[in-house]
Design a protein with these regions (language model features):
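Short helix-capping/turn signature of helix-turn-helix
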Residues: 50, 123-129
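Amphipathic alpha-helical segments enriched in hydrophobic/aromatic and basic residues
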Residues: 22, 31-32, 43, 53, ...
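Amphipathic C-terminal alpha-helical segment
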Residues: 112-122, 148, 152, 169-190, ...
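Short hydrophobic/aromatic patch on the recognition helix
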Residues: 40-50
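Hydrophobic alpha-helical connector segments
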Residues: 59, 72-115, 169
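Basic, helix-initiating cap at the start of DNA-binding domains
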Residues: 1-25, 29-41, 54-55
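Amphipathic alpha-helical packing segments from all-alpha helical-bundle domains
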Residues: 108-115, 130-156, 166-170, 194
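N-terminal intrinsically disordered/low-complexity leader segments
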Residues: 1-9, 16, 79-89, 211-221
């Protein structure tokens, strides 16, 4: 008799249950039977869909990182629309217009981190090369992508050219990783627009080219 085929709905239920259990107990301490019970299925049903709890965690992790990459892609598309419809930051737009756009996009990122905060909790407890390698590879890709965008904005005169782009990337990624961990102890969702605006207002004071504001003001007069 051929094995019973996996059920996509059961698989998703198991992943939801695993996400909660991993966030509560960590991957090492989580038990397959607890995951299966929370999903309303048997332990055998778990092994019909996954070879191990580590495999389930890797799929959860890949989905989470995929959400972050999708956001990065949507962000770039939004920036290009903004440049087309409103103007280029530092040249044809005001600081407030650019800040409002970045706050909106960063608040969306924080919403994604909030929805996936249990994964962040599990990652803090995870050990072993497979998961760490996946996250390290993701960080490298994000660093490269963000660094390229920062360098481009420096070339266009929107950001100061005398600041190392890698330092700006460290500040950006470090801040939002810190925000993600700050969420772990929270029961009520915070005001993400306020978080984003506070950070970006401070960041812009340090890295924005002062002359870009004068150029933008001249464009609007």
């Amino acid at each position: 008799m051929s094995p019973r085929p996996a059920n996509p709905r059961v698989r998703d239920a198991l992943l939801d249950a695993a996400r909660s259990e991993f966030g509560r107990a960590g991957v090492a301490q989580a038990r397959v039977e607890d995951i299966a019970r929370a999903a309303g299925v048997s332990k055998g049903a778990f092994y019909l869909h996954f070879d191990s709890k580590e495999e389930a965690f890797r799929e959860i992790l890949h989905r989470f990182l995929g959400v972050l990459e999708d956001h990065s892609t949507r962000r770039r598309e939004a920036e290009l629309r903004f440049e087309r419809d409103v103007g280029r930051p530092g040249r044809e737009t005001t600081l407030q217009q650019t800040l409002d756009l970045d706050c909106k996009l960063d608040a969306e990122l924080l919403e994604s981190l909030w929805r996936n905060r249990l994964i962040v909790a599990a990652l803090d407890r995870a050990a072993g090369p497979p998961c760490l390698d996946i996250v390290s590879d993701f960080r490298r890709r994000m660093r490269s992508m963000v660094g390229s965008r920062i360098a481009l904005k420096q070339q266009e005169g929107w950001l100061r050219a005398d600041v190392d782009p890698e330092v700006i990337v460290d500040v950006l990624l470090g801040t939002y990783e810190g925000y993600a961990r700050r969420m772990l102890g929270m029961k009520a969702k915070p005001d993400f627009d306020r978080w984003a605006r506070a950070f970006l207002s401070l960041l812009y004071q340090g890295i924005r080219d002062p002359s870009s504001g004068a150029r933008a003001s001249a464009t609007h007069t």
